[in-house]
Amino acid sequence: MNFLALQYATPDVNLWVILPELIICAVGVLVMLVDAFARPTQRWITGGLSLLGLSAAAVSSGWLWLFWRGASQAFNGMIVLDELRLGFTFIFLVVSGLTILISMVWVENERLAAGEFHSLLMFATAGMMFMASAGDLVMVFLGLEILSIATYVMCGFRRTDIRSNESSMKYFILGSFSSAFLLYGIALIYGATATALLPGTTNIAEIARRLPDAQYPLLLFAGAAMMLVGFGFKIATAPFHVWTPDVYEGAPTPVTAFMAAGPKAAGFASFLRVFLFAFPFVVATANNSVGGRIHAAWLSALIVIAILTMTIGNLVAIAQNNVKRMLAYSSIAHAGYALVGFIAAGAARDIAQRNAAITAVIFYLLTYAVMNLGAFAVVQIIARAGDRRTEVEDYNGIGFQSPWLAFCLSLFLLSLLGIPLTAGFMGKVMVFRAALDQGYYVLVVIGVLNTAISAYYYLRLIIVMFFRERTTAWSAPQIPASVGLALAITIFGVLYLGLFPDRVINALQAKPVMSISMR
C-alpha cells in the first residue's frame, strides 16, 4: 500500500450524515447575531430560535433514523451513523430543549445575556452530538472540547456571583486536567497501534482490528487506563467525582440541570463506543490475546468503579442539607447504576446481548435526564433569583402552600428512587436485567441495596415538604409559562416511560449499532 496515498486519501465528505450537527451550529451562530441586533425587550426571541433549531435537528435525526439508506460512515470513519449515535442524539435534544424552557425566564430575572447563554447551549449541544457520532478518538476529543469550553463559561455565567465564578474555575481546572489524561491516552494508543508498514491509528474500528497484532501491549494498557480516568471524570464516577458537588452547587440551577443530564450522557456515549468497540470481547482469543487482557482489565476496573460510585454517591447524599448538593451526589449514584448496564454490554458474548445492554443504558440515561431536569425545574422556581433558597429547610411546609410544586418534585424524587410505574423504575429494571443476563448477581444485589439507601434522602425531602411547618415567611412563587411547559413535559415523560417503555425501547433497537466482529 502506498504510504502517501494512505496518509492523504480524499475524505468521503457526506454532509447529510452530520446534518443535525450542522443545523445546531448554524443556529448557535444565528442566535448570537439576532441577540446583537435585538432590542432588550425582544431577547426572548433567542430562546424561541434555539427551540426551533433543536426541533429542526430532531426532524433531521428522525429522517436519518427512518429513511437514510446511504453509508453508515463518513469523513473516512470519523463520523458514524448507528443506534448509539441517534439514540443519544435524541437525549441531547430533549435535555437542551428542556434547559431552554427552564432558563428563558431565569435569564430575564437575573438580567443576563439571553443570546449568549442560548448560543453557548447550542454549541454545547453540538459538542455532545459530535461525541456520540465519533468513530475516531480525535473526533471524541474535539466534541468533548466543544462541549467543555461552552460549559465552563455557562457555569460562571452569573458573573457577579462568587459561587458561580468558583464553580466555573473548579470545573475548568479539573476538566482540563481530565482532558489531558484523555488526550495522552489517545496518543499512547496511536503509538501502540503502529506497525512496521502502517502508522498508528485513532480510528475505533481499526484499533479493534489491530489489537491481535499489537507490538506494544503496555502502551495499550496505559492508554486505555488514562482514557478510563478521563471518561470517569466526565461522567462523575468515583473516585473521579470530587468536583461534582461544588460545581453543581455553585453553578446557576438551569446550568446544573443541563450538566447533570446532557454532558453525563455524552460522556457515556463516547465511553461506550470507545471501550466496547475499540477493546471488544473476542471469544476465541479472550484469555491469551492483548485485546482479551485489556478487555478483562477494563471490565474488572468498571465493576469496582460502579460499586464505589453507587455506594459513595448514596451514602454522602444522606448527609447533605443543600438540595443541589444532594442532587449532585444523587447524580453520582445514578452514574453507577448506568455503569451496571455498561458492564453487561462489555461482558456480552454475542452482538444481540451487547446491543440489548447498550439499549438499556441509553434508555436509563433518557429516563434519568427527564426526571432530573424536572426536579431541577422545581428547584429553580423555589430558589428564585440568585439561588437563595436551596437548603432543605427552605422546603418546609411547601406542600400546603404550593401543592402543585410539591407534587411535581415528589413525583420526580420517587422516580429517581425507582418506585414502580415511574420512568426511574423501568430504567433500573433494564440495566439490572442486562447485568443478570450476564451473571452479575452480586453487582445487581449491591445496586438494589444502594437503591434502598437512596430512599432515605429522597423521602426525607418529601417528608419535609408535607410534614414540616414553616418557621419563616414564604409566599408561593408564580410558575412561568415556559417552566410550566417543561414540568408538563417531564411529568408526561416520567409516567409514559414508566407505563409504556416498550415503544421507546423498540425504537432504540430499530437501527443496529456499529458492527464490530465478536468472533
Provide a role label for each language-model segment.
Residues 1-519:
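Alpha-helical transmembrane segments of multi-pass membrane proteins predominantly involved
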